[in-house]
Amino acid sequence: LSLSLRAKASIAGIIGLLITLGIARFAYTPMLPIMREQAGLGLGAGGWLATANYAGYFTGVFLCGRISDLDLKDRIYRWGLILAVISTAMMGMVASELGWAISRFLAGLSTAVGMMLGGALVMNWLMRNGHRAELGVHFSGVGLSVVMSSFAVLMLSEHVLWWENWLFLSLLGLVLVLPAWAWLPKPMPAPAVEHESKMQDRPPTVAVRRLLLAFYFCAGVGFVVTSTFIVAIVNALPKMEDVGFWVFVILGAAAAPSCILWDLIARRVGAIDALLLASVLHIAGILLPLVGEGLFGPIAGALCFGFTFAGIVSMMMGLAGRFYPTRPAKMMSTLTIAYGIAQILAPAITGWISEQTGSYNAGLFVAAAVMTVGLVMLLQLRGVARLPDELDS
C-alpha cells in the first residue's frame, strides 16, 4: 500500500509539472516562431512576453513562500492546475500583446504554484513517510514537460492555426488535471513519531545562504535565455530552419532522467561538487549551439543543457528540503525568488539585444558569462569552513 501511495504521489506531482510547466510555460518556446510567422509577434515582443511570464512566476513564488498552512498549500496548488489551463486558453482567445502578456503573467503564477507548492507537498509526503528528501523523480517532470509540449505543438501546428494550437493545448491540460488532482495525497499535518528525528530544521549559515542565493540567480540567467529562445536561435542558423524544434525535444529528453542521475551523483561526490560539474556542462550547453555550422553544436548543446538545467533545480530544492524539512517551501521560495528575478530581467535584456543585433545569439554569450560568475560562487561555497553536513549528506 505504501509503494502504491508513493507511486501515485510521484506521478501526480509529475503530471502537475506537465500542466503548470509544460503546457503553461514550455509550450511558448516552440510556439514562439509560429506566432512570429502567423500572428506577427516581433523579436522584442517575444522577449517581453517571456518577461511577463517570469514576473508572474516571481509573484507566485513570493506569495507561495508566505503560506505556512499545509491545507491551504494543497488547495492553492489544485487551483493552480486550473489556472494553468485557463491561461493557456487565453493565448488563443486574444490577439493583442497586452492580452498575451496577461496570459503569460497568469501562466507564470501557475508555474510557481506547480514548482513550489507541488514540490513542497510531494517532499512533505515523502519525508513524513520515511523516504529520502530527494526530488529527482518529481523533477523528471521538467524534462518530460519539454518533450510533451514540443510534440503537442508539432502535431497540432501541421493541422491548425496558432490560436487553435493554444486552445488544443489547454484541452490537453484539462484532461491531465484529472489524475494530477485525484492522485495527490492530502498533506499530513504532523510527522510520524518514528520519523520525527528527520524533521528537525537545520538552517544554513549566513555565508552559505548568500552564496547559494547568488549562485541560483546566475543559474536562473543561464537557464532562461536558452530555454526561451533556443528554437528561434537554432532555426535562424544557416540551413537549420526546421532543426530548432528537434533540438528542443532532445533537450527535454536529456532532462527527463537527469534529476534522478544527479541525485545519485550528489550522493557520491556531495551536493556542491555535483553542482559544480553540472554548471560546467550547463555553460557548454549554452554555447555549443553557436559552434560550427553543422548539427553537432546544437545537438551537443541540447544534450548538455538538458542534462543539467533540471538537475540544478532539483539539487537546489533538495538542499532546501534538508535545511528545512518541516517547512521546505520556506527556503525553496527564497532561492526561487533569486532564480525568478534573473528570469524577469534576462528575457527582456535578451529581447532588447536581439533588436539591436537582429538575432538572439548575443543573449547566449551573456547567459554563459553570468553562469561563469555562478561557478565562482560555488567555488567560494566549497571553501566555506564548517560547511553544514546536510549539504553533502
Where are these regions (language model features)?
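Conserved MFS/SLC helix-loop-helix module at the cytosolic interface between two early adjacent transmembrane helices
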Residues: 61-95
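Helix-to-loop junctions at the C-terminal end of transmembrane segments
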Residues: 60-72, 258-270
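A late C-terminal transmembrane helix in Major Facilitator Superfamily
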Residues: 326-359, 367
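Helix-loop-helix hairpin linking two adjacent transmembrane segments in secondary transporters
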Residues: 133-185
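Cytoplasmic helix-loop-helix junction between adjacent transmembrane helices
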Residues: 103-141
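C-terminal transmembrane helical hairpin of 12-TM major facilitator-type secondary transporters
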Residues: 272-316
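Extracytoplasmic gate region of multi-pass secondary transporters
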Residues: 29, 209-249, 253-257
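Paired small-residue
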Residues: 87, 98-106, 296-304
